[in-house]
A protein has these predicted regions:
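Helical subdomain adjoining the active site within ATP-dependent kinase catalytic cores
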Residues: 122-168
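Intrinsically disordered or highly flexible coil/loop and linker segments, enriched in small
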Residues: 57-61, 90, 154-157
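Intrinsically disordered, low-complexity segments enriched in charged and polar residues
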Residues: 39, 43, 66, 82, ...
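Short glycine-rich, low-complexity/disordered patches
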Residues: 43-77, 82, 130-143
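Intrinsic-disorder-associated interaction segments
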Residues: 18, 22, 34-37, 41, ...
Length: 168
């Protein structure tokens, strides 16, 4: 039967052979932040951008609008990418692999919205964990999100936080 909502939680039973060793992209980003390594952080943001670009596809003709798929979105990330944050991506030697795909957004996800959400989640864990970073210790989650958006390899559109908060 079709899902009752645009967002569904799918039950997963991963095989232990599917687990990857090594740090998540988030762990690597936090290490770069602690080291005040902005160049290294920008490299990780570039790796994330490359992953997003590689997984972006044309919007399905039957995809219905939802908070993370606004009208006018021509390209999408697949539905399992709704939670594709730095905490859910692990390098596998040649690429980044999404290791937590239990959430599904029907019709896909706007790539910019998914990216802003991922950057907000990284800012949140940075601030909430007290991780040192190159900016003032009083930097808020919102401020750090905007800093990360500014370091991202390409513009993410106007008012990224307002769009994210409206979607959430």
């Amino acid at each position: 039967p079709p899902p009752a909502s645009w967002l569904t939680l799918r039950e997963r039973h991963p095989n232990v052979d599917d687990y990857l060793t090594g740090p998540t992209l988030e762990q690597s980003a936090l290490a770069r932040l602690r080291a005040h390594d902005e160049d290294g952080l920008q490299q990780l943001l570039g790796d994330f951008h490359t992953w997003v670009t590689a997984h972006t596809v044309p919007r399905p003709s039957d995809a219905q609008q939802h908070p993370f798929l606004p009208v006018g979105t021509d390209e999408v990330l697949p539905g399992e990418c709704i939670d594709a944050g730095f905490d859910n991506l692990v390098p596998d030697g040649t690429d980044l692999r999404l290791v937590d795909d239990e959430w599904w957004a029907e019709g896909g996800v706007d790539p910019d919205m998914a990216t802003v959400r991922a950057l907000w989640k990284l800012a949140w864990v940075t601030v909430e964990s007290g991780t040192r970073h190159p900016w003032p210790a009083t930097t808020s989650i919102s401020q750090l999100t905007l800093i990360l958006c500014g370091l991202y390899p390409r513009p993410l559109g106007p008012n990224p936080l307002e769009r994210l908060y409206a979607a959430e």
